């Protein structure tokens, strides 16, 4: 059985992992959001499979719904916010898929990497 890893914004679970990729399911609760972040060593593809929300990429917000897809490039700033029903996405990471490859620029849960702003 695949276990959910709780986060302040909801949860995720790893569906499959290989040497250079990782497939996850993420659920972001209504009106919650992940940190505004980027990754130095991986890309991500997101597919909305349930609910709705807002995707932010490089400061541009886009409403999203079931069936919408998004590509997150290396060092591209991004965030997802759950809509009134929350949002579930499938995320395919490619590259170095370690959890510590997250540089947080803004975070509602006090997990910001203060040195990160010097990068931009």
Residues covered by each model-derived region:
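Double-stranded beta-helix
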Residues: 2-7, 79-120
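Polar/charged side chains located within well-ordered beta-strands of beta-rich proteins
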Residues: 24, 45, 88-91
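Short beta-strand segments
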Residues: 34, 60-62, 101-103
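Glycine- and acidic-residue-biased ligand/ion/polar-headgroup-sensing regions
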Residues: 41-54, 58-59
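Short acidic-glycine-tyrosine-enriched beta hairpin
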Residues: 59-77
């Amino acid at each position: 059985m695949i276990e959910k890893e709780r986060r302040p914004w909801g949860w995720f679970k790893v569906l499959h992992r290989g040497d250079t990729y990782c497939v996850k399911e993420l659920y972001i609760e209504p009106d919650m959001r992940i940190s505004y972040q980027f990754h130095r060593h991986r890309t991500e593809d997101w597919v909305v499979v349930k609910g709705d929300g807002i995707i932010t990429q490089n400061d541009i917000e886009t409403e999203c719904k079931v069936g919408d897809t998004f590509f997150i490039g290396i060092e591209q700033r991004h965030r997802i916010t759950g809509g009134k029903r929350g949002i579930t996405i499938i995320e395919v990471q490619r590259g170095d898929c370690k959890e510590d490859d997250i540089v947080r620029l803004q975070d509602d849960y006090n997990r910001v990497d203060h040195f990160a702003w010097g990068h931009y």
